[in-house]
């Protein structure tokens, strides 16, 4: 059974807020590889603390960062 996926919209948010990966690393207290993996969508298990730090740094809601994509019927 197909359940759908979660799309990470970090690149679009960063562009909208005019924020570089380096600045996000600094503001969210994350290392480069973490930010890069979130930007590339290479995350299989989300860390609530990391998501909270990203949302705080970007001044956004969790729903702005993540989107549920239902399975194709």
Describe the role of every protein-language-model region.
Residues 42-53:
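Short, basic-rich loop-to-helix N-cap that marks the start of a DNA-contacting helix
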Residues 15, 29, 40, 70:
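Residue-level detection of the helix-turn-helix DNA-binding "recognition helix"
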Residues 1-19:
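A short, Lys/Arg-rich alpha-helix, primarily the initiator
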Residues 19-37:
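Short alpha-helical DNA-recognition segment
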Residues 37, 66-73:
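Short, charged recognition helix plus adjacent turn
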Residues 14, 25, 55:
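The alpha-helix within a helix-turn-helix
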Residues 11, 22, 52:
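Residues within the helices of the helix-turn-helix
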């Amino acid at each position: 059974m197909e359940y759908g996926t979660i799309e990470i919209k970090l690149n679009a948010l960063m562009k909208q807020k005019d924020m570089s990966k380096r600045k996000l690393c600094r503001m969210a207290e994350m290392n480069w590889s973490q930010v890069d993996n979130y930007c590339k969508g290479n995350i299989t298990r989300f860390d609530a603390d990391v998501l909270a730090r990203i949302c705080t740094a970007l001044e956004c809601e969790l729903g702005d960062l993540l989107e549920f994509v239902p399975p194709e019927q």
